[in-house]
């Protein structure tokens, strides 16, 4: 009986005291959840934050943290649900809509992604990230033409948006517009040195133009940037074969096959990559407090 008295009290408490207890319980659960999120104890963070939201469902910061924990545990539909509730409360918040678009992309729900982007575009027609996400939604639907249009709009707003230029170059090349793809590749090469994706685009452009000697050199730069690039070895092998270098072509093909059978297991940089991703999704700087 004493245990129950300790837990529930021997008599009813005044309303003000009960309110204080509820507030205290909410704060303890919320900040335990935030701390667990920082320490990457995601399952425990979810438990705490769900219980906190049961007490106070109007706390949007709590829902934001919960959405991040769900994303980290690959519970994307639950994350999207939390973001939807945040968007209902803050319909003018572009950051929430962009997060929804990002999660929809991870779920491969390109229709939802496009819908969210349209809402965001109505709020801020000059937000380059909105056009970038819309382009990715178009790509998901196989609509490369409109994807290029969206990326071009983003680049008109910000010519230094390298991710948009890279994706546009890749799509232009895929669509057979080699000359315009070459312009994007050259612009990126002048701006970014030693980037694997940029170098690979440049190599593929040279190959598509039929400039095999230049393509071979470009693929070599890709391999310098990433010695484990299976695509670079395989495609350079094709280029070397076209140049009549059968020995080099066979060596590249063998290297690609070997890496495909036993893919390299990187031991460094994984945690930093995860942390960087979480920071991108973190308007409250939960992960950016170091």
Named regions from a protein language model:
Residues 40-47, 73-85, 107-119, 140-153, ...:
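Structural signature of tandem alpha-helical TPR/SEL1-like repeats
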Residues 1-19, 31, 122, 136-139, ...:
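Intrinsically disordered, low-complexity, charge-biased linker/tail regions
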Residues 19-61, 65-72, 95, 99-108, ...:
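Alpha-helical segment of the N-proximal tetratricopeptide repeat
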Residues 57, 91, 125, 159, ...:
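Short coil turns that delineate tetratricopeptide repeat
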Residues 53, 87, 121, 155, ...:
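A conserved position within tetratricopeptide repeats
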Residues 224-230, 234-264:
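TPR/TPR-like (Sel1-like) alpha-helical repeat modules
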């Amino acid at each position: 009986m004493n245990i129950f008295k300790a837990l529930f009290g021997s008599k009813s408490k005044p309303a003000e005291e009960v309110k204080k207890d509820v507030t205290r319980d909410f704060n303890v659960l919320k900040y335990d959840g935030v701390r667990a999120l920082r320490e990457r104890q995601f399952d425990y963070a979810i438990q705490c934050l769900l219980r906190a939201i049961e007490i106070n469902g109007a706390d949007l910061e709590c829902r934001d943290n919960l959405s991040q924990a769900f994303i980290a545990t690959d519970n994307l539909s639950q994350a999207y649900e939390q973001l939807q509730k945040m968007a209902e409360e803050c319909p003018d918040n572009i950051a929430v809509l962009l997060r929804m678009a990002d999660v929809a992309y991870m779920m491969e729900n390109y229709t939802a992604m496009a819908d969210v982007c349209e809402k965001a575009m109505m709020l801020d027609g000059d937000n380059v990230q909105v056009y970038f996400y819309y382009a990715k939604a178009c790509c998901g639907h196989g609509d490369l033409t409109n994807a290029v249009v969206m990326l071009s709009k983003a680049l008109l707003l910000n010519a230094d948006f390298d991710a948009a230029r890279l994706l546009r170059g890749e799509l232009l090349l895929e669509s057979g517009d080699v000359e315009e793809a070459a312009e994007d590749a050259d612009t990126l090469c002048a701006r970014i040195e030693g980037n694997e994706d940029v170098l690979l685009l440049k190599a593929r452009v040279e190959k598509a133009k039929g400039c095999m000697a230049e393509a071979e050199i470009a693929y070599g730069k890709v391999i310098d940037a990433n010695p484990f690039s299976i695509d670079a070895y395989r495609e350079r092998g094709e280029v070397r074969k076209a140049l009549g270098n059968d020995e080099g072509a066979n060596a590249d093909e063998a290297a690609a096959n070997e890496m495909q059978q036993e893919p390299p297991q990187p031991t460094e940089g994984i945690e930093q990559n995860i942390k960087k991703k979480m920071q991108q999704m973190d308007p409250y700087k939960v992960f950016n407090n170091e």
